[in-house]
């Protein structure tokens, strides 16, 4: 097992429904430590850059519009095999297909409004953490 860092973003739908504490409880009870966290609004430009890999997809514009529709909570998580562990705690992208007891099954509303984003690989985690955090913001 390897100690890893991963990135997580609590999405506007969860924040509008006051679910930050519940999402954090899933993460912490699942074995992850929150080592950085901040709440803010993303600009359209930031959202477009962050989701650039999806730019050619049909859902890109609606994704950018959704993620900039309200505040988000940006997080750095730490733990043993944190990337896979976070993906397991989050559940499948589509809440209808996610397992019971996962964030997306229990709190998600739709594929887009599924309450949380998490890095899907080591490379993504490094890129996404660096996109929003500098090293001084990550508390060990």
Curated annotation (Swiss-Prot):
> Which catalytic residues are annotated?
117
Q: Name one GO molecular function term.
A: ATP binding
The record's Pfam families line, in alphabetical order, gives: NDK
* Gene Ontology terms describing biological process: CTP biosynthetic process; GTP biosynthetic process; UTP biosynthetic process
Q: Keyword Transit peptide: yes or no?
A: no
User: Which keywords has UniProt assigned to this entry?
Assistant: ATP-binding, Cytoplasm, Kinase, Magnesium, Metal-binding, Nucleotide metabolism, Nucleotide-binding, Phosphoprotein, Transferase
Q: What is catalyzed by this enzyme?
A: a 2'-deoxyribonucleoside 5'-diphosphate + ATP = a 2'-deoxyribonucleoside 5'-triphosphate + ADP; a ribonucleoside 5'-diphosphate + ATP = a ribonucleoside 5'-triphosphate + ADP
Q: Read off the InterPro entries from this record.
A: NDK-like_dom (IPR034907), NDK-like_dom_sf (IPR036850), Nucleoside_diP_kinase (IPR001564), Nucleoside_diP_kinase_AS (IPR023005)
Enzyme class of the recorded protein, top EC level: transferase
Binding residues annotated for ATP, in chain numbering: 11, 59, 87, 93, 104, 114
Q: Which cofactor does it need?
A: Mg(2+)
Localized where?
Cytoplasm
| This protein's GO CC annotations | cytoplasm
Q: How does it assemble?
A: Homotetramer.
Q: Which NCBIfam families match?
A: PRK00668.1 (NF001908)
Q: Which HAMAP family match?
A: NDP_kinase
Task: Indicate the family of this protein.
Answer: Belongs to the NDK family.
Name of the protein: Nucleoside diphosphate kinase
Q: Which gene encodes it?
A: ndk
């Amino acid at each position: 097992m390897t100690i890893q860092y991963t990135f997580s973003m609590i999405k506007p739908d969860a924040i509008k429904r006051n679910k930050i504490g519940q999402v954090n409880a899933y993460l912490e009870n699942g074995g992850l430590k929150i080592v950085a966290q901040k709440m803010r609004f993303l600009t359209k430009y930031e959202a477009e850059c962050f989701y650039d890999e999806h730019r050619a997809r049909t859902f890109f514009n609606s994704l950018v519009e959704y993620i900039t529709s309200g505040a988000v909570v940006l997080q750095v998580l730490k733990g043993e095999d944190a990337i896979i562990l976070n993906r397991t705690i989050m559940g499948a992208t589509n809440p209808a297909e996610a397992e019971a007891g996962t964030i997306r099954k229990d709190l998600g509303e739709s594929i887009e409004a599924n309450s949380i984003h998490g890095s899907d690989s080591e490379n993504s985690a490094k890129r996404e953490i660096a996109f929003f955090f500098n090293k001084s913001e990550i508390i060990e």
